[in-house]
Amino acid sequence: MRTYDFSPLWRSTIGFDRLFDLVETAQRAGEDNYPPYNIERVSEDRYQISLAIAGFSPDEVSVTAEQNAVIVEGNKADKAEREYLYRGISARPFKRQFNLADYVQVQSAAFENGLLKIELIREIPEAMKPRRIAINAAPSGTVHQLEGRAA
């Protein structure tokens, strides 16, 4: 896999740090795909992230909301060593980060049937929402014509 060094670009740009972080994150995206997840659009301003983390308990998983990101970490508690004939359920530690768009916030998280469901909502401030501006017509009969002078 080819890697790129973006440090020369950081020296000459201002305010684009998040853009370069997203590029680096996309570059590392193919490295690990555990745990599997779905991202659903529930309604126009509501989303849900579902992570399949069978074998983990809610105490072994943490969800952290940061600015424009939500981080899910899991670490299985060490228990007595067992002898497995076949081990198909992974219990390895993981860390998964999801980058969020502006104004998207974590509303809640729930653990149900081996799935961690994280509810997201997009709340755009009133000042940022589009609004319709009424167009007033000029009253008729108030048009004044200027007299032209000969040059």
Curated annotation (Swiss-Prot):
<feature type="domain" description="sHSP">
    <location>
        <begin position="28"/>
        <end position="138"/>
    </location>
</feature>
<dbReference type="InterPro" id="IPR008978">
    <property type="entry name" value="HSP20-like_chaperone"/>
</dbReference>
<dbReference type="InterPro" id="IPR037913">
    <property type="entry name" value="ACD_IbpA/B"/>
</dbReference>
<keyword id="KW-0346">Stress response</keyword>
<comment type="similarity">
    <text>Belongs to the small heat shock protein (HSP20) family.</text>
</comment>
<dbReference type="GO" id="GO:0005737">
    <property type="term" value="C:cytoplasm"/>
</dbReference>
<dbReference type="Pfam" id="PF00011">
    <property type="entry name" value="HSP20"/>
</dbReference>
<protein>
    <recommendedName>
        <fullName>Small heat shock protein HspH</fullName>
    </recommendedName>
</protein>
<dbReference type="InterPro" id="IPR002068">
    <property type="entry name" value="A-crystallin/Hsp20_dom"/>
</dbReference>
